C-alpha cells in the first residue's frame, strides 16, 4: 500500500454499484481507504474484500475525526508517500465536525482530486442506507440491484430446535453476528457450505419461530440433497417469498414449507450453480 499512487476514501459498506464507480477511477496502483464508523452491517469486518481486487486499508473514524482538514491531508500523505490522486464521492466530507467538502479537498491537496457524481438506478440515487431500508422491507430484488450482487450474510453453524429433521425439513441454523438480517419471512436463496466453492439452491427463513417456541432463527434448507455443515455457511438472497406467519399446527407449517420449496425450486432451476 505504501507504493499506492491513488486512493478512494469512504465508508463503502455494501460495496454497491456507486462504490464500484469510485474504484473504477483508481487505476493500477490504487488502494481503498475504508473509514470504519461502527455502522457497517452490509459488509461488516473484512467482507468488503470479497468485492474488489484492490487492497483495503481500514481506518477507525475515532482515530481521525479530531483532525483538521490540513491534518487529514497530512495523515493521508504519511500513509501514502507517493499519493497523486484522491477519488471521492460528490457528498464526501472530512475534517473535524465534517467541516470540509470536496471543494476544500481540491484546495488542500496538491494532487488530482477526482469527484464521482451520484450513481442512480432507475432514477434513484444509490446509497447504503437505501439498501438497508430495502432489506428491512423485504425488497431483495431492489437491494440486489443497488448492490450489483446478491445480498449475502454469513454465520457460524449452531444447533436448532431439533424438530426440523423429524417433523418438518432439515435446516442449517446460523448465528450471523454483525450482518443486517432482512425482514422476517421466507426467501429464495443460495447457500454455500463451509469451504465449498459452489452454492446450493435453497429456501431460507429469517425470524421468530412463532408456530413453535418463538425463538429467533436464521435457517436455510438446501434443495439439492442432504448436506453436512461443519462450521459455517453463507446465505445469498435472491427474492422474498412470503411474510413470517403463525400456523395452528406443525402439519400446516409443513405444507407451507412445501409450497416455499416449490417456489424456490422453480425460481432457481435455470441457474448454473
Regions found by a protein language model. Name each.
Residues 39-41, 64-67:
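Acidic-and-aromatic substrate-binding clefts and catalytic sites of carbohydrate-active enzymes
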Residues 31, 85-87, 114, 221, ...:
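A structural signal for isolated positions on well-ordered beta-strands in alpha/beta enzyme cores
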Residues 160-273:
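Phosphate/ribose-recognition catalytic cores of enzymes acting on nucleotide-derived substrates
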Residues 2-5, 25-30, 52-56, 81-82, ...:
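Short glycine/proline-enriched coil/turn segments at helix->beta-strand junctions
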Residues 55-64, 117:
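A conserved beta-strand->alpha-helix junction
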Residues 67-171, 194, 248, 252:
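Classical nucleotidyltransferase
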Residues 42-50, 71:
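Glycine-rich loop at the start of a catalytic domain that most often binds anionic cofactors/ligands
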Residues 1-45:
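N-terminal catalytic cores of NTP/NDP-binding nucleotidyl/phosphoryl-transfer enzymes
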Amino acid at each position: 500500500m505504501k507504493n499506492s499512487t491513488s486512493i478512494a476514501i469512504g465508508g463503502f459498506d455494501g460495496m454497491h454499484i456507486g462504490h464500484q464507480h469510485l474504484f473504477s477511477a483508481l487505476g493500477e496502483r490504487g488502494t481503498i481507504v475504508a473509514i470504519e464508523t461502527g455502522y457497517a452491517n452490509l459488509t461488516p469486518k473484512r467482507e468488503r474484500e470479497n468485492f474488489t481486487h484492490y487492497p483495503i486499508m481500514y481506518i477507525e473514524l475515532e482515530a481521525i475525526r479530531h483532525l483538521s482538514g490540513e491534518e487529514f491531508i497530512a495523515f493521508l500523505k504519511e500513509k501514502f508517500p507517493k499519493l497523486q490522486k484522491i477519488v471521492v464521492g460528490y457528498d464526501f466530507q472530512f475534517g473535524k465536525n465534517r467541516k470540509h467538502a470536496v471543494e476544500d479537498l481540491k484546495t488542500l491537496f496538491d494532487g488530482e482530486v477526482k469527484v464521482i457524481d451520484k450513481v442512480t438506478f432507475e432514477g434513484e440515487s444509490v446509497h447504503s442506507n437505501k439498501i438497508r431500508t430495502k432489506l428491512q422491507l423485504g425488497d431483495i430484488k431492489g437491494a440486489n440491484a443497488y448492490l450489483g450482487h446478491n445480498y449475502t450474510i454469513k454465520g457460524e453453524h449452531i444447533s436448532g430446535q431439533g424438530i426440523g429433521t423429524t417433523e418438518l425439513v432439515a435446516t442449517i441454523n446460523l448465528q450471523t453476528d454483525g450482518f443486517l438480517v432482512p425482514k422476517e419471512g421466507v426467501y429464495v436463496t443460495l447457500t454455500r457450505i463451509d469451504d465449498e466453492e459452489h452454492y446450493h439452491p435453497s429456501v431460507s427463513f429469517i425470524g421468530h419461530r412463532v408456530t413453535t417456541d418463538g425463538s429467533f432463527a436464521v435457517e436455510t434448507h438446501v434443495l439439492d440433497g442432504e448436506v453436512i455443515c461443519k462450521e459455517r455457511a453463507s446465505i445469498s438472497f435472491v427474492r422474498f417469498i412470503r411474510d413470517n406467519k403463525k400456523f395452528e399446527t406443525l402439519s400446516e407449517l409443513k405444507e407451507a414449507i412445501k409450497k416455499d420449496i416449490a417456489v424456490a425450486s422453480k425460481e432457481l432451476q435455470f441457474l448454473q450453480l
